Amino acid sequence: MPTNAGTSLSSYKHIVAIGTTVKSESLESAAYEIPRKRKMRSDSAAVSGNSVSTPKKLKSHLPSSVPNPGMSEKEVVEDSNEILRYPVNLAVSDCLGTKSKWSPRDEEQMRAVKEALHVSKAPSTILCREDEQIRIFEFVKGCIDQQKAGSLYICGCPGTGKSLSMEKVVQQVGDWSTQAGLPPVDTLSVNCTSLSKTTDIFSKILGEIKPGKNANTNSSPLQHLQNLFSQKQESSSSRMMLIIADEMDYLITKDRGVLYDLFMLTTLPFSRCILIGVANAIDLADRFLPKLKSLNCKPMVITFRAYSKDQILRILQERLRVLSYVAFQPKALELCARKVAAASGDMRKALCVCRSALEILEIETRGSTGPESQGPTPDDSVVRMDHMAAALSKTFKSPVVETIQSLPQHQQIIICAAAKAFRGSKKDATVGELNKLYLEICKSWMISPAGITEFTNMCTVLNDQGILKVGQARRDKLKRVSLRVDESDITFALQEIRFFRNCLL
């Protein structure tokens, strides 16, 4: 091989250039320790012909996709043949890309999936709430930079990530203040529902600012705080204080005066309080902002919207991605996300539904008897749509679902036919077209179909019940038919019956 010494030096420089931390000594030892192919005579001649009496050239442990820029294609091939490093790299990549086999009978796997879906499992990254976190962080950061008190009101329905986002922001504020060389911010988190008396919140704030100091008998904790923030403090005690009042709507139902007094603490001339109130009541700001505005303590408002179907699905997928096996059918997760988003957008409820579906599969697997239950786990032994539908039925029960479940079989077949017909861009069809699909389903399952007159009458009944919409036409077959209910409701209502589950595939 020509220019061995030059090539080895170039290869080593290339390794250093891309940030490899392997030292030359370790590379030399690696070159001697790695098993080598038997040398051919041509190789021996090439080595003996080299006048440079240096150790064997240093070999780059980079894959062939990152060769030495100074080497030709032929040299790369020869170099790769000299040291057997590729089988090792391929084995590692194969291991990294292989998914483990999922088995609902494996207690360790089942425990890991349940843990990943538990409400108390705080993810490292709060997905779909990045904008809200940035706004909260910038608000707190601005107050600290200006050494100025302020108030913020965070509202949103339960399960929309408010408390979780606040925990993340508190961590970010601590990291930022440390990096900026600023004094740490004192943080007080209070769940208002845990207070024996609503006025106890002032005692907690006072205890955080002045540890061990109780208000004297002549003044209440609130009065003590008002006096404290009305006069200039010593520089040693001028640290900012972040107060997070969770479940703040509890104060509204108990004592609105406490709510007003709490926000007014941020308006005092020497106040160092950064107040963040968190509540489920979205209309709280609308009901009490006028009063707070008149008191010159109107807070900034950030609303956490309910999670959409796509957001719920993304969060569920992210939680399950840490597992080395697939435990849920993708369509089952989509069904959960769609139903929860339509009902409430509560992420905690979506997690509970998924855990419930997993438990249904677990019970089903344990309940199976016979010799076949001792064999290998079937490939479809994941959480399917029927498991998810059963779990959803425990949580949600809409009148539409109950109506569909109570219908006669042939009317349910018509609904399934309509759901299949309108899955794409097509939103309606004629009675005749729908009847053709109905007949195909009946024929495939060897069910005696109803005649066209009876079929038309059943469509009229479904129209009266608000499930189908049947238009007007001179001939019954030409009447336009469309669905009035969501396909997810149909799937949800009928998935527990195997016949309909297969019809909806």
From Swiss-Prot:
Ranges for region Disordered: 37-72
Location of the protein in the cell: Nucleus
Polar residues composition bias: residue spans: 45-54
Keywords: Cell cycle, Cell division, DNA replication, Nucleus
Any one GO biological process: DNA replication initiation
Record GO cellular component, one term: nucleus
Task of the protein: May be involved in the initiation of DNA replication.
Family: Belongs to the CDC6/cdc18 family.
Protein name, entry field: Cell division control protein 6 homolog B
Species of origin: Arabidopsis thaliana
